[in-house]
Amino acid sequence: MQRFRSLVLIAAFSAGAVLALVRLFERAATSGRSAQKQRGNQGRNAKRWVFKIAAFLLVAAFGGLLFVTSGIMPIKASSRHWAITAWFLNFAMRRSVVTHSLGTRVPALDDVALVAKGATHYEFGCRPCHGSPDFAQPAIAQQMTPPPPHLPWVVPQWQAKELFYIVKHGVKFTGMPAWPAQQRDDEVWAMVAFLQKLPNLTPEQYQELARGKKVSGAVIDELSGPNNPPQAVGESCARCHGLDGGGRGLSGFPILAGQRPTYLFASLLAYARGERHSGIMQPIAAGLSAQDMREIARYYANLAGLSSPRAVGAGLKPASTISSSFSGNRHDRRDASAIERGREIAMRGMPSQRLPACAACHGPSSTPRNPIYPQLAGQYAEYLALQITLFKKGSRGGTPYAHLMRLVASRLTPEQVHDVTRYYASLGSTTESPAQ
């Protein structure tokens, strides 16, 4: 009843407005008749056309308003787009992506760690709509309008820089979201690296990249013992960080085994609150309860570090065995000169640059340290270098002490970042007790 009254009022208002305009035009025409005779038929006809066009535009505007407010226009996804509408929207989207991606610099995308990092998030965040080599057409997503494309088929139509723009910014009116953390271009490029490999992956290769190697029950028993993995570890954490906490042997995923539980819990909390930016970790952490976070932190903290023979034997296969189709981009940890220079920075700092010693907060040290400071010994050099770079850019949040690292990172040169991260990577992750 209320809608009917609204329609009647709109119709009456529109009719009244049109009649008023017609009368106004008639008066104007009458008052200017003598002048029009002097100007001749050409001027009179031109003025009449102006009046007619103005009246038409006004009527069209009111008609459009009436059409929209009446609710007659269907918005149901089940009706699909008309063919001409679908073509126009697709054409406009493609031209926009091409234009806005101009000038984008594409980094190297062949690192297997980068590809695997994108693959694990694709499995969690993209596969339900876009499918995969082992899951062709998601039934629910196909009822969207427009339906999400099956990416293994359409990715070859796009350049890397265009894929970057789409993944980072999303697409309006399609259900395609923007990347949850706009500060993390490195994560977006990881997704692009994976997408470029996706069309040529077999179902088995996809499973291995996205979910890692399957671990036998005997290995799980040997690895965990009384420290049974919490449910959240199996559901969310293990596909990237492994049940052994070794990051699947890939620098794209940090080593969690032996890390300090206070730091792990604080990091998960920071991700969940959006205080540490990551389009990969934020959605996962946001779905965890505080109890889940504590259990995850306790589980990984109680695992032996990767320098332990038990952990090395039980861990997943290294990156070189994942697939011969991909080439890694690993740095040699045995660069003795870089490690020695890094040791000097870590243990003594650089007074001339007002750089404090890294060991004061991160070890190695025989004195107790703040338990919220992370342990770095044995961590992947590439992962540490990425975190320092993010701190430099102001794109890395974290625990309440994260602001201290922004200042330190801003004073490190690229060469010093290389050296100090190689030094920490060369150390065993059990150099000191996680409690210190």
Where are these regions (language model features)?
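Feature marks short, highly hydrophobic, charge-poor N-terminal signal-anchor/signal peptide-like helices
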Residues: 2-10
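Cys/His-rich metal-chelating microdomains
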Residues: 132-133, 243, 364-365
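A cross-kingdom feature marking solvent-exposed beta-strand/loop segments within repeated
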Residues: 137, 143-150, 175-178, 246-255, ...
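Extracytoplasmic
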Residues: 146-148, 186, 251, 291, ...
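C-terminal functional regions that serve as terminal interaction/effector modules
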Residues: 290-293, 356, 360-436
